[in-house]
Amino acid sequence: SLHRGYIGFESDSQCFLNTLHYVHHELKWPLTYYKHVITPLPFEEIAERPDKDVLIAIRQSLANLEINGPNTIIGVLPDKKMITCCDSKKLRPVVVGRTDDMVAISSEVCGLNEIMPDRDQTKDIYPNEREIVVIDNDLEVQRWKQ
C-alpha cells in the first residue's frame, strides 16, 4: 500500500515533493534518477545508453509519476542543496544566476535582474529539458545531464 504521505495530492508541488521523497528516501536511489522518473527519456534514446536496463525499469515501473508539463521545479533539499529542473516540453522558463557570494534560481530572468542587477548575465544558466541543476552549500553549481 502507498505511504499515507502519498495519498490525496492537492497540487503539482506536492506531487513533485512526494515523488522526490519516494525516489530519494524510500527507494534510496541517487538524486540523478529523479529526473528519469518525472521526465523519462524516449525509449529510442534509452536503448542507446549503457544504463538502459535501469532506465527501462524506471520508465515501466514508475510511469504513473511522470509529469506531463508544463512545469518547472525549484526546490531546497534537506541537506540545503538547491535544485531546479524542467518538464520535457520546457514550456516554463527557469534561470540560474550568480555573483561572487550568491546563487539564485528564478522562474524569470527579471527576478534575477531585480536581486542581482550587477551579475554577469552571460554566465546565466538556462537549464534544458534534459538536466537538473544542483547548487551545493559552497555555491558550486553542477549541471546533471540525463
Question: Residue locations for each model-derived region?
Answer:
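Conserved short alpha-helical segments that host acidic/polar catalytic motifs at enzyme active sites
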Residues: 1-146
